[in-house]
Amino acid sequence: MSWTIGRPDAEAPEDRMAASHLFTRLDDLVAWSRKHSLWPFNFGLSCCYVEMATALTPVYDQARFGAEVIRSTPRQADLLIVSGTVFRKMAVPLYRLYSQMREPRWVISMGACANSGGMYDIYSVVQGVDSFLPVDVYVPGCPPRPEALMEALVLLQSKIATEARPLQIRMGETGPARPFDPIPRRDALREARMAVTRLADPEAT
């Protein structure tokens, strides 16, 4: 590889311009192929999975987004849709399944329980799957309609189309991994949220 220094207004050599254009188009081609060939992993936890299974029927035609090939093994999938309540007992197997997926891989959190624990603010329920997995798209609802999952796939496709190559990868203890904030926003704002619900003592005033 050779480097040259020139003025900003100077014309670039034709061979360098052609190579740059080639790699730019190659990035676009790779992004296009990735976003139109998502292979979801068939994994459900509770009632939101029923809506996810409904989205796979011919009525909604998920094949339009290239995501109709449901995989039964994480080693052949690149999209994990977490649908339903994530109990602490299931967090470890879920993370193990995610770690078996090949890079690049993406995660969709489907439903209020997967997003933030939902109405189960108890010790046995993980308060948001983003506390141990890097979530790319959140789907609100209890349960969300299949159309909401369709919109999540479209949003994920637009995100994949703008990701640069190589993807944001850092070297971890077990190999390359995409960086993510391990502290979810729900936990960061928990104290402020709880302060709103505290009632003042009427005797103190």
Curated annotation (Swiss-Prot):
Subcellular location: Cell inner membrane
Topology class, membrane: Peripheral membrane protein
Sites where the protein binds [4Fe-4S] cluster: 47-48, 113, 142
Entry's EC annotation: 7.1.1.-
Catalytic EC class: translocase
Catalysed reactions, semicolon-separated: a quinone + NADH + 5 H(+)(in) = a quinol + NAD(+) + 4 H(+)(out)
Single GO cellular component term: respiratory chain complex I
The keyword Membrane belongs to this UniProt entry's keyword annotation: yes
Biological processes per GO annotation: aerobic respiration; electron transport coupled proton transport
Keywords: 4Fe-4S, Cell inner membrane, Cell membrane, Iron, Iron-sulfur, Membrane, Metal-binding, NAD, Quinone, Translocase, Transport, Ubiquinone
Cofactor section: [4Fe-4S] cluster
Cross-referenced InterPro entries: NADH_UbQ_OxRdtase-like_20kDa, NADH_UQ_OxRdtase_20Kd_su
Lineage: superkingdom: Bacteria
GO molecular function, one term: NADH:ubiquinone reductase (non-electrogenic) activity
Database matches in Gene3D superfamilies: 3.40.50.12280
Cofactor note: Binds 1 [4Fe-4S] cluster.
Pfam families from the UniProt entry: Oxidored_q6
Function comment: NDH-1 shuttles electrons from NADH, via FMN and iron-sulfur (Fe-S) centers, to quinones in the respiratory chain. The immediate electron acceptor for the enzyme in this species is believed to be ubiquinone. Couples the redox reaction to proton translocation (for every two electrons transferred, four hydrogen ions are translocated across the cytoplasmic membrane), and thus conserves the redox energy in a proton gradient.
Assembly with partners or alone: NDH-1 is composed of 14 different subunits. Subunits NuoB, C, D, E, F, and G constitute the peripheral sector of the complex.
Family label: Belongs to the complex I 20 kDa subunit family.
Name of the protein this chain belongs to: NADH-quinone oxidoreductase subunit B 2
Organism expressing this protein natively: Cereibacter sphaeroides (strain ATCC 17029 / ATH 2.4.9) (Rhodobacter sphaeroides)
Lineage: Bacteria, Pseudomonadati, Pseudomonadota, Alphaproteobacteria, Rhodobacterales
